[in-house]
Amino acid sequence: MILLEINNRIIEETLLVKYRNAQAGLKPESIDIRIADFDGVLYHISNVNGDKTKVRISISLKFYKQLQEHGADELLKREYGSLLTDTEEGYNVSVLINLEEIPEDCEQIAKRIGLLKRNCFASVFEKYFDYQEQGEEGQKRAVINYRNDETLYVEAKPDRVTVVFSTIFRDEDDVIIGKVFMQELREGRRASHTAPQVLFSHREPPLELANTDARVGDNIGYVTFVLFPRHTNKETRDNTINLIHMFRDYLHYHIKCSKAYIHSRMRAKTSDFLKVLNRARPEPKNTEKKTITGRTFKRID
């Protein structure tokens, strides 16, 4: 299985090129790039007021207001500090790099900016991991509508944090492949005693979402992760967040890859079958004959 990168490689590499060109003394060039990411996230890389030495990176998330309720602004201040700048119109967060003042850790800065989406998501997980660590119970469940008609639920208890993703399967085939994929995850957990418990429910929401407005339907699936203190403590939580916030994209990416592989195998088998049929086709009878003098004639039966 393929693990998707948690950072946006286009942003990271674009900023690294800008830094390296500036370090080499090359004249800065203007930039105006818009980039789409998973979950409807949009980025915009541009110059501020036409100044080619000032590069602004902005991110837009449809669900950012819901993340703000769980400390997204505070987490971004902690992660980006002085890099934060006035937010570009139409976006939620903006950071600024100055090509006239290149820091020694410019590569790390480019990597951190490439993690903007991940760090926005991280706020809700860190908040509920802290609730669990402090033994707080009875806190309101977090509800993040991270995609159209798809929702993330996070709830903390003294001994665990439960994370539930709702997702929509666009095709009946997707449901079947999704079930097989989730079965593989459950089988994989048997080989690793430190892996979290993973549950999958189709059509009906899990018991954790009983008496809520969670959707019901033939194309609805719910994936539940049960995270224990070994997954949420200070030493391991960053890796847990890295993996879990991308899970929905990871699931659907592998569903699409599986379908593409099945289709390619079907096309290959069809091609092989056609070759067999073509070899079995009888050769047309040649009824044209020649006389001893070299003249030709066709025999008509």
UniProtKB/Swiss-Prot annotation:
Taken from the UniProt entry, a GO cellular component term is:
Arp2/3 protein complex
- UniProt-listed InterPro entries: ARPC2, ARPC2/4
Reply yes or no: does the keyword Manganese apply.
Answer: no
UniProtKB keywords: Actin-binding, Cytoplasm, Cytoskeleton
**Which Pfam family, an example, fits this chain?**
P34-Arc
Q: Does the keyword Cytoplasm apply?
A: yes
Q: Where is the composition biased (Basic and acidic residues)?
A: 281-291
Task: State any GO BP term from the record.
Answer: actin filament polymerization
Stretches the record annotates as Disordered: 281-301
Cross-referenced SUPFAM superfamilies: Arp2/3 complex subunits
Q: Which parts of the chain span the membrane according to its record?
A: none
Major localization class: cytoplasm
- GO molecular function term, any single one: structural constituent of cytoskeleton
Q: Where in the cell is it found?
A: Cytoplasm, Cytoskeleton
The protein's matches in PANTHER family, at most eight in alphabetical order, are given as: ACTIN-RELATED PROTEIN 2_3 COMPLEX SUBUNIT 2, ARP2/3 COMPLEX 34 KDA SUBUNIT
**Role, per record:** Functions as actin-binding component of the Arp2/3 complex which is involved in regulation of actin polymerization and together with an activating nucleation-promoting factor (NPF) mediates the formation of branched actin networks. Seems to contact the mother actin filament.
Subunit record text: Component of the Arp2/3 complex.
Q: Give the family this protein belongs to, as stated in its UniProt record.
A: Belongs to the ARPC2 family.
* Name used for this protein in its record: Actin-related protein 2/3 complex subunit 2
Q: What is the lineage of its organism?
A: Eukaryota, Metazoa, Ecdysozoa, Arthropoda, Hexapoda
Identify the coding gene: Arpc2
